[in-house]
Each structure stands twice: as structure tokens, then as C-alpha cells.
Amino acid sequence: MRSGRTVDEFGRQNNFAIEPQVVVAEADASWGFHDRAEKLNGRLAMIGFVALILTEVALGQGLLPFLASGLS
């Protein structure tokens, strides 16, 4: 990160003018936001959505009413 002092046109110090350097995760990184993680997240979301639809078809009602009926 750069150091130094930045002032505006009125001579006031601007503490937020220096921004940190942006680092992009490499494609082979094992963590962080990258294409492989985003694809996995999307695929798992699709699997969960299909599982929810199949559960509703099998039970004949939504998942929340089914869980609520089991608790009472």
C-alpha cells in the first residue's frame, strides 16, 4: 500500500484517498472467488432446488408446512 498524505482543494487531509491494491485470485487457487468456486456454488444450488421440488411432489405439500406439521 502506498504511503503519503493526500489533501483536497481546501487543504483538508483525505484519509480515504489511497485505496489498497486489488488482487485477483488465480485460477488454480483453492479458495476465494474464482470460476471453479462459482460453478460449484451454482451447481449445488441447482441440485438443492431440484431436491426441494421433488420433495414437494413426493409429500404433496411444501417443505415448510410438512416440517411445521411434524413439530406439532
Curated annotation (Swiss-Prot):
The keyword Lipid biosynthesis does not apply. This is High light-inducible protein HliA. It is a single-pass membrane protein. Its main location: membrane. One of its GO terms (biological process) is photosynthesis. Belongs to the Hlip family. Keywords: Membrane, Photosynthesis, Photosystem II, Pigment, Stress response, Thylakoid, Transmembrane, Transmembrane helix. GO terms for cellular component: photosystem II; plasma membrane-derived thylakoid membrane. It is found in: Cellular thylakoid membrane. Induction: Transcription is highly up-regulated 15 minutes after a shift to high light (500 umol photons/m(2)/s), declines by 2 hours to low levels. Upon a shift to low light (50 umol photons/m(2)/s) transcripts are rapidly degraded. Also transcribed in response to blue and UV-A light. One of its GO terms (molecular function) is pigment binding. It comes from Synechococcus elongatus (strain ATCC 33912 / PCC 7942 / FACHB-805). A high light-inducible protein involved in photosystem II (PSII) assembly and/or repair under stress. Binds chlorophyll and carotenoids, protecting against photo-oxidation during PSII assembly. Forms homodimers that associate with PSII assembly intermediates containing CP47 (psbB). The chain crosses the membrane at residues 47-67. The keyword Disulfide bond does not apply.
